[in-house]
């Protein structure tokens, strides 16, 4: 009988933001685990704030009832309302009850997929704390990738929920050394382990190393940023560097 890991995470599996938990899911698959990858829920309210291509992709996954990628099955639940840092949606009531308004029932879905009992219960989202009381597991892990209070989308209730999960799981792993001190609310520091982000060497070995045509006319030396440009992007730092390194070309790709 194969080992199983249930991953309750923030970003949907096909997101353009392929972050730590996506890579861990594939690593678990390589180790022979069956993986159920559940990401943060959507709701009808989402369309009011942003009917983006990302939302449409999440809706597509939900309507299909989830999809498989090898040994990984990924799914986006849909609820009547979901936790957000907005009036009412930031309340403890929404945070603690959104799963009771999912259609189909998220808990039934998980159990019907055969993940009512798992070897590992994995978190990187504060929205899924109820799984600690509803799923049978051998080990539970919370991965802290960033300091949650640094994100405007994270409500006080969500931060408190993350702390509650941290104090309940068997192990907490974190990606930056300063996070251990920042999370003073985590009581048992002995279960916290520093596990920095890794590098997919095979990806870079196979990559095309030719200079993109779009960059040919931009003089060297070049400083290139590739990634998300969101409210956490340090524009002031980039401006400071560009001002003090006038002979360098700064290229931002988002």
What is the role of each PLM region?
Residues 169-192:
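A short, active-site helix/loop in glycosyltransferases that binds the activated sugar's phosphate group
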């Amino acid at each position: 009988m194969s080992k199983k890991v249930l991953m309750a995470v923030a970003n949907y599996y096909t997101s353009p933001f392929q972050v730590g938990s996506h890579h861990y899911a594939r690593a678990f698959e390589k180790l022979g685990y069956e993986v159920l990858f559940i990401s943060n829920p959507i709701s009808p309210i989402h369309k009011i704030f942003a009917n983006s291509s990302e939302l449409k992709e999440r809706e597509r996954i939900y309507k299909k009832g989830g999809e498989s990628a090898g040994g990984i099955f990924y799914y986006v639940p849909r609820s009547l309302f979901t936790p957000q840092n907005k009036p009412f949606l930031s309340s403890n009531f929404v945070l603690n009850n959104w799963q009771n308004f999912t259609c189909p029932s998220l808990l039934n879905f998980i159990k019907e997929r055969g993940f009512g009992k798992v070897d590992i219960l994995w978190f990187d989202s504060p929205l899924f704390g109820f799984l600690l009381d509803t799923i049978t597991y051998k080990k539970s892990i919370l991965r802290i990738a960033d300091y949650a209070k640094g994100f405007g989308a994270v409500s006080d209730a969500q931060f408190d929920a993350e702390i509650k999960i941290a104090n309940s799981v068997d192990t907490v792993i974190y990606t930056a050394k300063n996070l251990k001190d920042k999370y003073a609310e985590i009581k048992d520091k002995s279960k916290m382990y520093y596990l920095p982000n890794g590098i997919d060497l095979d990806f870079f070995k196979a990559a095309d190393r030719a200079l993109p045509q779009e960059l040919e006319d931009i003089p060297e030396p070049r400083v290139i940023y590739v990634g998300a440009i969101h409210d956490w992007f340090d524009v002031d730092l980039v401006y400071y560097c560009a001002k003090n390194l006038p002979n360098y070309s700064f290229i931002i790709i988002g």
